[in-house]
Amino acid sequence: MESHIQIFDTTLRDGEQTPGVNFSFDERLKIAKQLETWGVDILEAGFPASSAGSFKSVQAISNTLTKTAVCGLARCKKSDIDAVYEATKDAVKPVIHVFIATSPIHLTHKLKMTQQQVLESIKEHVSYAKQYFDVVQFSPEDATRTDTDFLIKCVQMAVDCGATIINIPDTVGYSYPNEYGRIFKTLIENINSKQDITYSAHCHDDLGMAVANSLAAIENGAKRIEGTVNGIGERAGNTAIEELALALYVRKDHYGNETRLKLSETKNTSDIISRYAGIRVPRNKAIVGQNAFSHESGIHQDGVLKNPETYEIMTPQLVGISKNDLPLGKLSGKHAFAEKLKSLGYDIEPQNQAELFKQFKAIADKKKSVTDRDIHAIIQGTEHEQNAIYQVDTLQLQFVSNGLQSAVVVIKDKNGNIYQDSSIGTGSIVAIYNAVDRIFKHKSELIDYRIDSVTEGTDAQAEVHVSLTIEGQPVNGIGIDHDVLYASCKAYVEAHAKYASEINKKEGNH
């Protein structure tokens, strides 16, 4: 059997625990399809028992994917296991992920259980899960702070009861490569099983070592890595799958193993997650950041021009970044636009290209040239707005006096209902956001506001990122438009729409 490092993607489960991130039902389906295109082996679609909305999205993903294994998370509770079974039973490859905490601090303060009670719970619930699933994965939560002898007992119990995947979570990002690698070596040497056991690594990045720890696990026998796209996740995030995959590819001379990811889909996957999560990828991010293949130093530039391998250990094309960014202009027609969409990997029916072409022409009238990044922004922005609960319809601004501005904001929902209100503020942005708050009637507080440009130049499209709390809940929003104020309004409305979507999801609506 061909050996490869399996990728277990938990963007839709652990990744969504990032503060402010709330994927809509439609976004979750689109992300799942893209992850299947990228080639992940297993997709953890969610925690079905947590809410009616989560159950429905896991169920929909299970019914949609045609090649990828779909996994649901369950505590050591029979009701959780039942929920995962019902949500994933129609998946082409259903998998259950059962977990329980094993560290002293968790046993004492969270579970209030003894070690013996934990072992009995593992026995009861892994055995129960095995009645419904051919593939059962078990995780001892906070494994890296668990006594080694007790960890061995927990894993052995899970294996004896039918678990064939053993995942070792560094839940709080506490471990370091040598230590984490030794845990795998110890388990592999001490666990007895008549079946083949796959060992999996799940690392958090609190100390900045998630990818390094995952690679150490591979060096010590792990065959599966859990992670998220762009490394999103609670606190400092999770193992960034794209970084792990490219490390294995570039240094296959050392690791001797690779993933089966379609690496040319890496940048596209990263962009989609960035867009839907409302979190911009840092410019200096490894693999997918804007500066990943940029060279400022004259010496470096000279070397790259003579031979790219002087300062580039991989090509931009490898991860799906096109070097042939031939811009379109205001004289470009529908055929040229359609060919550009095709070259960028978009499969859009001709009848659905009309609105996109209209947006392209509007931008082309304002810019000297429309680049690939502009096109990506148009596509992703349009898809996102089409799926949004609310969209900005019109925005009017007027100077009042003494630095005060008035704003009239009109938005519409999916059903075409119109909502309008106005307000004043010390500047355009404050006035706009006050008006939006009046429309939604929620208590909100702006935490962060940033403007980035989609492309270079004074004629670039603006990309506005906002982070705010609505009724105490953190949410993010992104707005893209050639007009900075309109983009700002879009971002703020999107944040409110995400909050509304989260409320609907908890109530089981989508």
From Swiss-Prot:
Which SMART domains does the entry mention? LeuA_dimer
- What family, per the record? Belongs to the alpha-IPM synthase/homocitrate synthase family. LeuA type 1 subfamily.
Domain of life (superkingdom): Bacteria
Q: What keywords tag this UniProt record?
A: Amino-acid biosynthesis, Branched-chain amino acid biosynthesis, Cytoplasm, Leucine biosynthesis, Manganese, Metal-binding, Transferase
Q: What residue spans carry the region label Regulatory domain?
A: 391-510
**Could you describe the subunit structure of this protein?**
Homodimer.
Q: Which Pfam families match?
A: HCS_D2 (PF22617), HMGL-like (PF00682), LeuA_dimer (PF08502)
- GO MF, one example: acetyl-CoA C-acetyltransferase activity
- Gene Ontology CC: cytoplasm
Query: Which positions bind Mn(2+)?
Result: 14, 202, 204, 238
- Per the entry, which co-factors are needed? Mn(2+)
Q: What class of enzyme is it?
A: transferase
Q: What is its EC number?
A: 2.3.3.13
* GO BP term (any one): L-leucine biosynthetic process
* Species of provenance: Staphylococcus haemolyticus (strain JCSC1435)
* Protein name in the entry: 2-isopropylmalate synthase
User: Reaction catalysed?
Assistant: 3-methyl-2-oxobutanoate + acetyl-CoA + H2O = (2S)-2-isopropylmalate + CoA + H(+)
